[in-house]
Amino acid sequence: MRKIALITGGSRGLGKHTALALATQGCDLILTYQQNRAAADEVVSAVRASGAQAVALPLDVGRSQDFAAFAARVAEVLPQQFGRTQFDFLVNNAGIGIHAFFADTSEAQFDQLMQIHLK
């Protein structure tokens, strides 16, 4: 049975490259994206071209109030797309960077960083 990985922030950067690498190792994937559906669809197409299954779902990891709805969506997708009820592992990759010196970082920027990375 193929393993299924859920990769947050899987539409670009490290998440994208992790998705592509796992696909070549025989993993099927659920990847998330925040805004750029087209980029996520490109990753899904590349994963499928390598012979793995993949689906992309929207998720803003900074909005913890949306997690229950996201979990419900994953529970729907797993049997529909993969014939399973659970995924095997999580790559918790989604995140942001504040490109400023700490002293120049606003409280709002710092709060957003903490919301996404730690909450």
Predicted ranges, named:
Residues 4-7, 87-91:
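Conserved hydrophobic beta-strands of the Rossmann-like cofactor-binding core
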Residues 87, 101-102, 106-114:
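Substrate-binding pocket helix/loop in short-chain dehydrogenase/reductase
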Residues 54-56:
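Hydrophobic/aromatic anchor residues within beta-strands of the central parallel beta-sheet
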Residues 37, 58-73, 107:
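The beta1-alpha1 cofactor-binding region of Rossmann-like NAD(H)/NADP(H)-dependent oxidoreductases
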Residues 1-30:
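Canonical Rossmann dinucleotide-binding motif of NAD(H)/NADP(H)-dependent dehydrogenases/reductases
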